[in-house]
From Swiss-Prot:
Molecular function as annotated in GO: 2 iron, 2 sulfur cluster binding; 2-methylcitrate dehydratase activity
Keyword terms of this UniProt record: Lyase
UniProt name for this protein: 2-methylcitrate dehydratase-like protein oryR
Protein EC: 4.2.1.-
Broadest EC class assigned to this enzyme: lyase
Record's function text: 2-methylcitrate dehydratase-like protein; part of the gene cluster that mediates the biosynthesis of oryzines, natural products with an unusual maleidride backbone. The two subunits of the fungal fatty acid synthase oryfasA and oryfasB probably form octenoic acid. This fatty acid is most likely activated by the acyl-CoA ligase oryP to give octenyl-CoA before the citrate synthase-like protein oryE catalyzes condensation with oxaloacetate to form tricarboxylic acid.
Pfam families per UniProt: MmgE_PrpD_C, MmgE_PrpD_N
Keyword Lyase attached: yes
Family statement: Belongs to the PrpD family.
Associated pathway: Secondary metabolite biosynthesis
Amino acid sequence: MTIPAADDNNCPSYDKVIDLIVDYAYDYEIDSPAAWTRAKAALIDALGAAIESIHTSPECAAMIGPVWPQTATVPGGFRLPGTQFQVDALKGAFDLGGMIRYLDHNDAFPGAEWGHPSDNLGAILSTADILSREALARGSPEEVISMKQVLTALIKAYEIQGVFQIRNAFNKVGLDHVILVKVASSAMVSWLMGLSRDQARAVVSHAWADGHPLRVYRQAPNAGPRKGWAAGDACMRAVHLANLVRCGQPGIRSAITTPRWGFYDVLYRGQTFELPRPFTSWVMETVLFKVSTAEGHGLTAVEAALTIAEKLAQRGLRPEEDIVNIRARTQEAGMIIINKKGPLHNAADRDHCLRYMVAVVLLKGSQITTADYQDSSPWARDPRVETLRSITTMEEDPSFTRDYHDPQCRSVANALEVTLRDGTKLEELVPFPLGHVRRPETLQLVREKAQQNLGLKLSSERVGQILDTVDQPKFEKMAASDFVDLFIPQPASSAA
């Protein structure tokens, strides 16, 4: 009988990846004007998306607020934007993270992994708000978290998540991309809390050591609303882990690399991480804003469909009668994420179906909106939509995939070819969607989107005040709690 060798129980150093994340979080000085400008846009875009979610989706609105049987107000808690709720740190992180993400209308960053960096704001802003209220309550206004610190944490969370996304395909091993929200938020919440560098390493190590969510809830046949609150779950876990370490819990030094038991061997099929560029502020500088409501890899297909719809209208043609075939060329990611046939069971299913998006736009002749994905939408039951879906084919264009991954290009191209009954073909190719860094109108459109979304719960005067405040030089010195207070509806408004 072979007797197993004794385990080596010498204390290892923290994994290099953990050191890289924490050193960046604590040391890097952001000196990019573009990053600061776009961080402000990302902030108001995410908060607008959060308010849009609770205004539009009864499902989302039902999830937020205190956990039964608590009261709606936790003294010193996080004041949840768009509502009258004041909740504890964990529920606050969950609620805001879920609200930002629920309708798939927040920003996106492409790569070997796909993700949405503004998800991290759920953990960052809720923590900053509570820490600021705590400092003010004990008479230490000099210890509040400033909005510059919030923006710093946001830029760095974007960077940590995005740089991992470039080459590390968690989807290939069946894991969901919110693993990166948990890791990035863990680092930046630790920094906001004032934890020591060693404590921050401990928090990040625990984030990697968690058993991670499966991607199953984003893919057919199980796509459903969990993909909308998964980010909130990751935000909540990041705050929870930081609080555990704050209370004295030690880290797991080789959580990633330990043979047999670590992340690489257990969950990553023995692969190792590849970080192709240093952590700077590049992700914030290049993140894709969603100025229209469509899954990121289908945004350009929607734009192409709009142009073709205009051509059909000019000819007096009806899509359901005069189109015999629709051929869509997309990237590899689009083929994996939004390529669906068969029945669509819920809003989360519809907003991840390129055929549905294209069909609705062709029939409407205008932009698809959040409401068009909901169960209550007439499009969800319109047989004409199913007719167009049934004659739509999808295929990968290798050049689109290549340009998608090229760091000098980063296109998200789609092309549509619509064949009419008389044999005429209408073709449209869109390489860069509205919201892309290469589209000069992007930041203005993001502002207009935020203005519209914030107005769903706040008065026009308050919305104007928020946008003006963010534009002021003194904004960076503003206490996070004062900023959050601007998003609480006036008493005359109904809470979510």
